[in-house]
UniProtKB/Swiss-Prot annotation:
GO biological process: translation
Cellular compartments annotated: Plastid, Chloroplast
Quaternary structure and interacting proteins, as annotated: Part of the 30S ribosomal subunit.
Molecular function GO terms recorded: rRNA binding; structural constituent of ribosome
Keyword annotations: Chloroplast, Plastid, Ribonucleoprotein, Ribosomal protein, RNA-binding, rRNA-binding
Pfam families: Ribosomal_S7
Family affiliation: Belongs to the universal ribosomal protein uS7 family.
Gene3D superfamilies, alphabetized: Ribosomal protein S7 domain
Protein name: Small ribosomal subunit protein uS7c
Organism, as annotated: Cryptomeria japonica
Summary of the function given for this chain in its UniProt record: One of the primary rRNA binding proteins, it binds directly to 16S rRNA where it nucleates assembly of the head domain of the 30S subunit.
GO CC annotation, single: small ribosomal subunit
């Protein structure tokens, strides 16, 4: 039996304006070089832009986008007797949400446009409508998991 104590799970904090954990998760992944106030400004401006364009609550649109981007399966490489297989693995909800946020931010950074809050707001709106590069990334991952279904027993 191990003598080490169990590690307590880290609880995500709430953001100052919306008091929402999801917002804080997104802001922490926008963050670069420790400039958190800039990350908050970018995100809040993109939420304002979403509200102007859709005339809906931006948090609901964000939640829809993240929900539609969250993958159920991912593929991981497994080495079995000299050959490498892409094995489909089910992932936890939180891990899927983190992946969805990462894909959303990557695709919004690649998007052409004036500045980050424009690109992020349009990517969130596209993801909520099941369009955009982030959705394409999710579908690609699911397709790869489906095609490698035969190797699922290696997990």
């Amino acid at each position: 039996m191990s003598r080490q104590s169990t590690v307590e799970k880290k609880i995500e904090k709430f953001d100052p304006i919306y008091h929402n954990r999801l917002v804080n998760m997104v802001v922490n992944r926008i963050l670069k070089h420790g400039k958190k106030s800039l990350a908050y400004r970018i995100f809040y401006q993109s939420l304002k832009k979403i509200q102007q364009k859709t005339e809906k609550n931006p948090l609901i649109v964000l939640r829809q986008a993240i929900q539609k981007l969250t993958p159920k399966l991912i593929v991981k490489s497994r080495r079995v007797s000299g050959s490498t297989y892409q094995v489909p693995i089910e992932i936890k909800k939180k891990e899927g949400k983190i992946l969805a946020i990462r894909w959303l931010l990557e695709s919004s950074r690649k998007r052409s446009g004036r500045n980050m809050h424009f690109k992020l707001s349009y990517e969130i709106m596209d993801a909520a409508r099941e369009k955009g590069n982030a959705i394409r990334k999710k579908e690609e991952i699911h397709k790869m998991a489906e095609s490698n279904k035969a190797f699922a027993h290696y997990h």
